[in-house]
Amino acid sequence: NVSAYELLFRSSLDDVFSCSDSDYASLALLVNSFIAIGIDRLSSGKPVHVNFTQRLLQDGVPSLFPPEVVVVEVLETTMPDPAVLNALARLKEQGFTIALDDYVGQQHLEPFLKLVDIVKVDFSLASSAHRAMIPRSGVKQDAVFLAEKVATRDEFQAAVRHGYRLFQGNFLSHPEIKRGSDIPPDALASLHLL
């Protein structure tokens, strides 16, 4: 069963991220998904995980979207400074689900663990011992663990054994690239101004 989708920016039909401006990539993804393509067409009514940069979190950009539709993903490169932690607390008050992306036990991300609802553990980076240990780490009681980049049946079965409840990766499904029309420059500029 699909519980949610993850929306990722791609500037070409190759399944790789190739944009040097992460703020632009996130904003372009949001405009394409909600305006050019249509979020219902992409998600069939399921929530969508969207990566938000530190700057976009601080600027409150996730608040422009419905909390029942968008799961706010905090990137592993985001520093847990007071402005970001306050922004995440406000988003939670508004009803957003918060996910921590690509967690493999990085100490600098620990302040997020008390806030997030979903901890996404990157199975391509974490050792098998680390994968087993992370769900027992200092995370809030009701946090859900998502095993991402699960590539084999063995990884999937190990994730189930270790208490992961959500799963993502090529073992389960391959990403699909959906193409929208070109984004009108004024639409992207308007979103950025908001």
Residue ranges and their predicted role:
Residues N1, R10-V16, E73-M79, Y103-G105, ...:
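EAL-family c-di-GMP phosphodiesterase catalytic domain
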Residues N1-V71, E76-M79, A83:
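Bacterial c-di-GMP phosphodiesterase EAL domain
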Residues S33-D40, R90, S137, A158:
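A generic secondary-structure signal
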Residues I35-A36, Q58-D59, V84-N86, V104-Q107, ...:
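A generic local structural motif
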Residues S44-V48, P66-V70, Q94-F96, L115-D117, ...:
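Short, well-ordered coil/turn segments that N-cap beta-strands
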Residues V84-G95, A132-Q141:
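Surface-exposed amphipathic alpha-helices with a cationic face
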Residues L91-G105:
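Sensor-1/coupling segment of RecA-like P-loop NTPase cores
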